[in-house]
Amino acid sequence: MSDAATRRLMKELAQLKSEAPEGLLVDNTSTSNDLKQWKIGVVGAEGTLYAGEVFMLQFTFGPQYPFNSPEVMFVGETIPAHPHIYSNGHICLSILSDDWTPALSVQSVCLSILSMLSSSKEKKHPIDDAIYVRTCSKNPSKTRWWFHDDSV
């Protein structure tokens, strides 16, 4: 990892640890050992379908971060059922691929995912979940997403 990427990640991590927005939980054990991979908990907002539920996001940073997006996916025993989240934890969200810009941060990605969860009207995986999970790469960054529905 480049020095610039390391400095950027250290700055983002320090900010998250000191000023984590409501609904985000920084897993100190995962982030302190290795800057290349972080785990951050997201807590469903009150008044939403996911109220009080806790889900774990895993961020994996490549050597070109922040010029290339991190690999972001849900991990652990509980993957949220959502029309843009596959049962293997992969997330169909444009800012994780085509719309990524170095101005985005781990915090902004987490808040976008929380917003996506909060606006959902039903708990169900995408209609192509079974096929996708059977045939996809383990790395969600290698998926060529087709963004066709931004209403959830």
Swiss-Prot record:
Keywords: Ligase, Transferase, Ubl conjugation, Ubl conjugation pathway. The active site is at residue 92. Residues 4-152 form the UBC core domain. The keyword Ligase applies. GO terms for biological process: proteasome-mediated ubiquitin-dependent protein catabolic process; protein polyubiquitination; protein ubiquitination. Gene3D superfamilies: Ubiquitin Conjugating Enzyme. InterPro entries: Ub_conjugating_enzyme (IPR050113), UBQ-conjugat_E2_core (IPR000608), UBQ-conjugating_enzyme/RWD (IPR016135). Accepts ubiquitin from the E1 complex and catalyzes its covalent attachment to other proteins. Together with ubc-18, required for the ubiquitination of membranous organelles, and the removal of paternal mitochondria from early embryos. This is Ubiquitin-conjugating enzyme E2 W. It comes from Caenorhabditis elegans. The gene is ubc-16.
